[in-house]
Amino acid sequence: LKCHKLVPPFWKTCPEGKNLCYKMYMVATPMLPVKRGCIDVCPKDSALVKYMCCNTDKCN
């Protein structure tokens, strides 16, 4: 599985066990990702921060 890094078009290969790509962004600025990468479990959204997770190649 390959997930985008914070600055596309760069990406990295996920280590074993981290089989989800995720994108974290502030609710106030949904078009500006704060963090991207590989993760094992999708975190819960909060009032300020949202997470978008998926299990396909480079979809974050």
Curated annotation (Swiss-Prot):
An annotated GO cellular component: other organism cell membrane
Any one Gene Ontology molecular-function term assigned to this protein's record: toxin activity
The keyword Disulfide bond belongs to this UniProt entry's keyword annotation: yes
Entry's localization field: Secreted; Target cell membrane
A GO biological-process term: killing of cells of another organism
Keyword DNA repair appears in the UniProt entry: no
Keyword vocabulary terms for this entry: Cardiotoxin, Cytolysis, Disulfide bond, Membrane, Secreted, Target cell membrane, Target membrane, Toxin
CDD domains: TFP_snake_toxin
Tissue specificity statement from the Swiss-Prot or TrEMBL entry: Expressed by the venom gland.
Resulting phenotype, M52V: In toxin V(II)2A
PROSITE patterns named among the record's database cross-references: SNAKE_TOXIN (PS00272)
Main location group: secreted
Entry-linked Gene3D superfamilies: CD59 (2.10.60.10)
Cysteine pairings via disulfide bonds: C3-C21, C14-C38, C42-C53, C54-C59
Family under the similarity heading: Belongs to the three-finger toxin family. Short-chain subfamily. Type IA cytotoxin sub-subfamily.
Subunit structure: Monomer in solution; Homodimer and oligomer in the presence of negatively charged lipids forming a pore with a size ranging between 20 and 30 Angstroms.
Any further remark recorded for this protein: The sequence of the major component is shown, it is called toxin V(II)2 and the minor component is called toxin V(II)2A.
Chain's role: Shows cytolytic activity on many different cells by forming pore in lipid membranes. In vivo, increases heart rate or kills the animal by cardiac arrest. In addition, it binds to heparin with high affinity, interacts with Kv channel-interacting protein 1 (KCNIP1) in a calcium-independent manner, and binds to integrin alpha-V/beta-3 (ITGAV/ITGB3) with moderate affinity.
Protein's recorded name: Cytotoxin 2
